Every structure is written in C-alpha cells, then in structure tokens.
C-alpha cells in the first residue's frame, strides 16, 4: 500500500507518516514534506522518482502527472482499469494526505500580489479531488485532526465505506472553500466584492437541538474560526434562537469600545441598555427600561461577570448571559438554576468578528451588502439644525441613542437618559407609531422621560413624532434628516425648545 503525503501544514505529519510506515505502508512525498519526513527518519520516496520528471517552474508543476493521478484514480475492481495501469506502469496510490498552500493566511500577511498568486495551490486540489472521486479505493486525508483516527482504523481494519465517504465529503468541502476564498479575494480586490458570483461558506461549530422552531433542523457555522476562538459554554447549550439573540446583544454591547455596557435583548430586539460607571450599575439601569421583556432574555456584559453582578441578575429569570469573562464564584451563583445558559468569550471585553459584508436570504437567493457600521464621523460631523444647543450630557446620550437605533429593527425610535435607554419603539410600519409605542410603554412602567434624548435611525417624515416627544419632555433629537418636510421637523423642534441634530446617514435595519 502506498500513501502520498504533501502538506503545507506540517503539524503531526511526521508522526502520521511513521504510523503508516509501521503498518507497512510506503510513503511518497514532495518538496518540503519529503525533506522533513526524511530528516525525521521516514523513508519517503520523492514523487520525481515515480514520475521520472523533475519539479518544474519553481515548483508549480510537481504532481500533475499520469503516474500520480492514474495511481489515484484507477478503479481497483475494474479489470480494464487494472490492465491499463499495468500496461502503463502505474502503481496504485491508496491514501492521499494533502492540505493546501496557505492562501488566506498569505492575504492577511501581505498585499504583495505576486506572493499571493504563488500561494494558490494547483496540484494539491487536483490530488484531493482525484482521491475523493475514487474514495472507495483511496483514503483522502485533508485535516490534521483526522490523523489519529485514520491510523487507528487502518490498524483495526475499520476504514469502511461510510468512513471513507465522510472523508470524501470533507475533502470536497475543503477544496470548495479554498476555491471560494480565492474567488472572493479576487472579487474584493478588483471588483469591490460585488462581482458576478459571491460565495458564502462556513465551518460547523455545533448542531442546535432544532432551528427557530422545533420542526426545523439547525446548526451554527462560523467564519474564520470566530466562535471556536471566542465562544465557550460554561453552563447549558446554545439554541438557534439563543445565537441570534446573543449576536444582537453583543453587537449592542460592543458599540461603545471598552465602556462598562450591559445590553438586554429579547427576540433580537433591545429591551434595555446602559453605559454607567460600573457593570452592576449598568445592569440595574438597563433592566429598568423594560423588565417585563427582559424576563427570559439575553444579557450581554462588556466585561467580567463577577459575583455581585451575578447575584443581581439572579433575582429574575434570564435565559442567557454572554460575558467577556466570568469569575468562578459568579458561576457558582447560578449553580441551582437549571435553565440558565452562560457563555463567555474569554476576553477582557466583548469582541466582534469584524465581518465586512452582510447578507440576507430571500426566496430564491440572497441579497448581499457591505456591513452597516456607525462611524465616529457621523457623530463628530452631525449638524445642529435647531436654535438650541444640546448640553454635554445630552450629547453623550445622543451618541448612545444613535448607536442603539442603528442596531434596532426599523421603524424605530430610541429614548436615552443619563446613559441608559428608557424607552424604545421598534419594528413598526410607521415611525409615529413607534414613537407612541415607546411613550406608552414608558408610562406603563412609570418611567420619567423628561430631559431625555430621542434618536431615529431614519428621518422623521412629519413633525408628529417631535410633537409626541415634546409632551414627555424630550430635550434633544438626533436623526439623519433628508425628508422633504425637514423644515417642518426643524420648526417643531424650535417651537418646543429642543435641540435637533442631523447626521446625514440613515441606518435602516430589516
């Protein structure tokens, strides 16, 4: 039996090759892999000895040869294939171990296009695809994580068809994602990311018990190993809906750099947020906005969950806590709470993945766009449209309200006072209804909106929302502007003695 080993990632390859040798396999290898194997006592045969053809064009051509691909592809149970292999002096290759040139890593490390091009693997994907096509006869190995299991199965004789089929699937996933990465990179470099095709792929992190509803299957996939590196379960398992809520909560909590932010989310909608002097104070103030909706919600903590904060959260039922870090004694507080789920990023503060693009599934396809981000320039360059100036505290609240509004389902309005969200209306078909809903909820909870700041993610089409805001004591309004009735909105703000600022940037969220 012969194994062809040609890998860019050399981790574990010596041990794997030695394991194969101990089982009686002959090792065939190329270039750097051949060198490291021989230096470590593996009696490998160089590919050039088999092909009788040297590496060409600075290593661009090594394994693209009938004696390699023929040895991989011929069917062992087809007499004509066996006869042809014998006729042309082609010996079988029964295992192919290949991982590919580090294209993605090269694009991160350098912008040198010549170097990037040289890290596009040609022979590697060809061998992987050949071996995967003939998976019944050839084991295809593309992951370091599979080395031990393959050796064990070969030793036991349990490398059955199902196992080989699973390796085949993994191999095609490997080459497909590799080619997609190259295509997306070229697209982004030369066409701004919006070429004729766009490839979206991820690696599975875990299956969820079900999808959005019990009759649907679900799973979490990741880009660039984000969750592998930044998500750990401390208590319980995340559901599909948990992950979408966690995403919304983390996006909110990470909108204010390293500030001690606590965000509370229910069904991906914010129902509480505060930026105070401590995480404990932020949680207490965030909860006041809508304690009814917070029941069974998701709490995101931009910092460490300590015992004091844990005890406060434990006074009500929340389903999920996601924190940058969690103290051991804080975790112990929830020891007897069976239903709560606790996750950490194991970081000092919560982090985002920094995805550059966003997409939404629609029936028959998807729409694709650049990710919406609130830039600092929007707030630095906002224009005062009213006669009255906002004071320093109001400007701070305007920043919070504006960032929350940008992450809230349209149409929305957000009311913030003293660093805490005090009312919110979202997902409404008219903006004035969002304003009315927010005020009604605040009155129901006996929350004082006097002196607060109002933000809207899109322009106010009429002055009616400003008139409603004035009745509850709003003192400052921030919105994009851009309505044909902006003059009426400005007039209303001046009539009610409000300060009004236009950012010039809309942040619809659907």
From Swiss-Prot:
Alphabetical list of Pfam families matching this protein: AICARFT_IMPCHas, MGS
A cellular-component GO term for this protein: cytosol
MF terms (GO), sorted A to Z: IMP cyclohydrolase activity; phosphoribosylaminoimidazolecarboxamide formyltransferase activity
Domain-level remarks: The IMP cyclohydrolase activity resides in the N-terminal region.
HAMAP family assigned: PurH
Pathway listed: Purine metabolism; IMP biosynthesis via de novo pathway; 5-formamido-1-(5-phospho-D-ribosyl)imidazole-4-carboxamide from 5-amino-1-(5-phospho-D-ribosyl)imidazole-4-carboxamide (10-formyl THF route): step 1/1; Purine metabolism; IMP biosynthesis via de novo pathway; IMP from 5-formamido-1-(5-phospho-D-ribosyl)imidazole-4-carboxamide: step 1/1
UniProt cross-references to InterPro entries, sorted A to Z: AICAR_Tfase_dup_dom_sf (IPR024051), Cytidine_deaminase-like (IPR016193), MGS-like_dom (IPR011607), MGS-like_dom_sf (IPR036914), PurH-like (IPR002695)
Entry superkingdom: Bacteria
PANTHER family with a match to the protein in the record: BIFUNCTIONAL PURINE BIOSYNTHESIS PROTEIN ATIC, BIFUNCTIONAL PURINE BIOSYNTHESIS PROTEIN PURH
UniProt organism field: Campylobacter curvus (strain 525.92)
Residues in MGS-like domain copies: 1-142
Catalytic activity, as annotated: (6R)-10-formyltetrahydrofolate + 5-amino-1-(5-phospho-beta-D-ribosyl)imidazole-4-carboxamide = 5-formamido-1-(5-phospho-D-ribosyl)imidazole-4-carboxamide + (6S)-5,6,7,8-tetrahydrofolate; IMP + H2O = 5-formamido-1-(5-phospho-D-ribosyl)imidazole-4-carboxamide
Keywords from the UniProt entry: Hydrolase, Multifunctional enzyme, Purine biosynthesis, Transferase
Gene Ontology process terms (BP): 'de novo' IMP biosynthetic process
Stored SMART domains: AICARFT_IMPCHas, MGS
Protein name listed in UniProt: Bifunctional purine biosynthesis protein PurH
EC number: 2.1.2.3, 3.5.4.10
Keyword Hydrolase: yes
Family (UniProt): Belongs to the PurH family.
